[in-house]
């Protein structure tokens, strides 16, 4: 990056707590916070400069020398991409982009032992993400290698923009877990419920013809007011269960069933039901494999079948 003032800063904080209450209740919690600041070039930042460098013809001079010995930056005309802006001009003459990002994560768990082999669990997690981007770019004039100006100079302008993004994602889950061993039989079962939801909002504004280049506030722009804003939210609710059985650690079976309901689909089409099954054979524990224990510590064959849903459609598809 060319010039002074370009920088990035990052601050991290993390805390973790674990405790047990009366040997039956376990509580854990973790929180983390990230504060990231970056000051970069305008016009897509340094990545834009690198992309332009790859597209610029190596046969063109960097500058076109005019009689007064002041150099004008040279742009190229490429039939594949159209006019390609001089990357050195972007590095020297473009404005600034300031990006501030804050992320707060938290997860809390509680596990209660009711009786031997029967536990109730609860988990809550939250992710809060905010990002603010302020950008200012002055008017940039461009010329071909023969000194003639690009037609784009007629529309060249300075502009200022600001954007803000807020996202909050939360998850709540409850489980009931059962495990029991009777002789050579191992039984297990799980029942659960989960709820996940997300709220997202954006706000942006752009102005042209900035009065004073040193004042980078949105109200400094005089013409071409453009404002935008969005809000969307979605939620996913799930019920799930699992049973598993093992005999003598050799023969294994597991069955799962889950029901998922999403707000991203229309009423009457929001719920889906998804089963899965698996069976396994731990052949390394059979007597006829005892001769190979020195070279094969574990050998297992497993077959499974299952279905899963997919709610990954654009957030504004429905409703």
Label each residue range with its predicted role.
Residues 1, 253-262:
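Transmembrane beta-strand segments that form the barrel wall of outer-membrane beta-barrel proteins
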